[in-house]
């Protein structure tokens, strides 16, 4: 591209190299471009005494045209160097992407080694997150097929943004469509500091295909709650993906998908609430029955009434935490109550029954308070249910 700068020279490469470095430092692009054709390829990749190569210096000085020429003269091995001598681990690509050098990035991407292209720097930037952030769709398209999934899903330190979120933010439709299938569930379901999901952001920007793909992926991941997320703060407070999609022209099919998802989500929540009620009902009934028994003990007749109540309640709590079926326990408690006429006998049999279950499960209980203080009573205990 810059062949007209070529000329013969008998000057030693070392002297040319020093001139090149000084010209780059002084941002003298014309002199740099005149010197490059006179030098050998290996000289152009050589670091100076401070560890800086001509390319890293040119990137630092924002000499985009110089960078493009240097990349064209360097070997694949030389452009794949990972700079570890500085505090932040960088490659030529990450440095170029930070500067927004589109041409340099496009030339580097297909030639770099897998290790270099998948570098994660100290700020958790990757080649892909930087390219998406700098709105370089063609570079992203080249990167995605050659990057590891775990690197694609890295989120940068400051805003915890994934490559997909950056691509949505910059309206990079094709890039988003490539990323959605390989993005993790965690990143797909990410809610940002403004309380927006990726789906909400895509709907807000009118990215129809991206919305459709996100909905499909989120349904596949059973993330109906994220699909139906409602923003709780800021200017968009009260908005959802559905309400934002309804404001976009040509989004009728997207709205239909979201409405269907909303109905499924409501049904799912209703079933969850019903299940919780069913699970809590036996415990409620058990509690009522125990309280009724305790109330039958006349106040003052037994000094350890509160201890009894605490002991039994603690055992039931432990059984519940260990995923026991309280419905079955409730049925057995009813048998105990029906088979024992004396209140003290009922309570003693009840504790004995709970202890049997606990002992069978080798549960280590802190509460081993016995009801024997109630006195000797005749107990009828039914264990026919094999608990």
Swiss-Prot record:
Residues 251-278, 311-352 form a coiled coil. Gene3D superfamilies: Ankyrin repeat-containing domain. The keyword Cell wall biogenesis/degradation does not apply. The keyword Kinase does not apply. Keywords: ANK repeat, Coiled coil, Repeat. Disulfide bonds: none annotated. ANK repeats lie at residues 50-79, 88-119, 123-154, 159-188, 210-239. This is Putative ankyrin repeat protein RBE_0984. The lineage of its organism: Bacteria, Pseudomonadati, Pseudomonadota, Alphaproteobacteria, Rickettsiales.
């Amino acid at each position: 591209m810059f062949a007209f700068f070529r000329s013969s020279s008998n000057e030693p490469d070392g002297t040319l190299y020093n001139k090149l470095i000084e010209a780059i430092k002084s941002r003298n692009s014309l002199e740099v471009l005149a010197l490059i054709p006179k030098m050998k390829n290996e000289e152009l990749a050589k670091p100076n005494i401070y560890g800086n190569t001509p390319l890293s210096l040119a990137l630092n000085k924002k000499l985009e045209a110089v960078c493009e020429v240097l990349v064209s003269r360097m070997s694949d091995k030389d452009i794949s160097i990972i700079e570890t001598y500085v505090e932040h681990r960088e490659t030529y690509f990450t440095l170029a992407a930070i500067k927004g050098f589109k041409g340099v990035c496009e030339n580097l991407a297909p030639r770099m080694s897998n290790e270099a292209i998948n570098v994660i720097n100290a700020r958790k930037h990757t080649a892909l997150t930087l390219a998406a952030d700098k709105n370089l769709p063609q570079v992203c398209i080249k990167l995605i097929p050659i990057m590891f999934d775990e690197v694609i899903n890295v989120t940068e330190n400051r805003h915890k943004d994934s490559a997909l979120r950056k691509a949505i933010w910059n309206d990079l439709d094709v890039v988003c469509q490539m990323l959605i299938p390989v993005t993790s569930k965690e990143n797909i379901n990410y809610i940002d500091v403004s309380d927006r999901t990726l789906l909400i952001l895509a709907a807000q920007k009118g990215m129809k295909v991206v919305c459709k793909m996100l909905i499909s992926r989120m349904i596949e991941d059973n993330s109906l709650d994220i699909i139906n997320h409602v923003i709780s703060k800021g200017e968009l407070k009260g908005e959802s993906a559905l309400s934002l999609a309804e404001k976009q022209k040509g989004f009728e099919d997207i709205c239909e998908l979201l409405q269907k998802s909303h109905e499924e989500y409501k049904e799912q929540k209703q079933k969850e609430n019903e299940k919780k009620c069913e699970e809590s009902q036996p415990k409620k009934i058990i509690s009522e029955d125990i309280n009724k028994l305790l109330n039958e003990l006349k106040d003052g007749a037994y000094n350890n009434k509160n201890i009894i109540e605490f002991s039994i309640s603690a055992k039931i709590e432990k059984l519940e935490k260990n995923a026991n079926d309280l419905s079955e326990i409730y049925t057995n408690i009813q048998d105990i109550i029906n088979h024992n006429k004396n209140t003290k006998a009922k309570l003693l049999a009840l504790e004995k029954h709970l202890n049997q279950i606990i002992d069978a499960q080798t549960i280590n209980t802190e509460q081993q308070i016995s009801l024997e203080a109630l006195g000797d009573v005749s107990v009828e205990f039914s264990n026919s249910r094999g608990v």
